[in-house]
Amino acid sequence: MSEPTPRRPAYARLLDRAVRILAVRDHSEQELRRKLSAPVMGKNGPEEIDATPDDYERVISWCHEHHYLDDNRFVIRFIASRSRKGYGPARIRQELNQKGIARESTEKAMRECDIDWSEMAREQAVRKYGEPLPSTFSEKVKVQRFLLYRGYLMDDIQEIWRNFAD
């Protein structure tokens, strides 16, 4: 009989897992920590990695040093992705907050991104309700509620009707 092969150290398994996770898409540091600490599905069901908190810190710092993990890059790409899907600034900020991104980083990236939120709100309203946009009060309320849900600010929503009246 052959002896079972020894398992790799926890640090090496964590590092391998982190690189595989980050190869798929960018993650925030908090997301990566959460995914690394979750059990891994093995051949015999979920397996815990017996890693110490120091192992996790070493993996996170290695990912930062080798530019696999960069919260600023993540924020910029996340804003671009969510805005392309039609979400507004309030919703994007809230989602970034849930992902553990500091408010300062979010605000800096929002200022740097070149997005006309009122035009985006108008595009979403036209896509959902058609051209011309509704003009009765009850229909305007529906459009407003939809855009607020999507994360647009009231100023951007009101801008739609100011421009529409011109």
Curated annotation (Swiss-Prot):
Under the heading InterPro entries, the entry gives:
RecX_HTH_1st (IPR053926), RecX_HTH_2nd (IPR053924), RecX_HTH_3rd (IPR053925), Regulatory_RecX (IPR003783), WH-like_DNA-bd_sf (IPR036388)
One GO biological process term is: regulation of DNA repair
The protein's UniProt keywords, in alphabetical order, are: Cytoplasm
Q: Which family is it part of?
A: Belongs to the RecX family.
User: What would be one Gene Ontology cellular-component term for the protein?
Assistant: cytoplasm
Statement: the UniProt record of this protein carries the keyword Transport: no
Q: What is this protein called?
A: Regulatory protein RecX
What subcellular compartments does it reside in?
Cytoplasm
**Annotated source species:** Salmonella arizonae (strain ATCC BAA-731 / CDC346-86 / RSK2980)
What does this chain do? Modulates RecA activity.
**Keyword Hydrolase set for record:** no
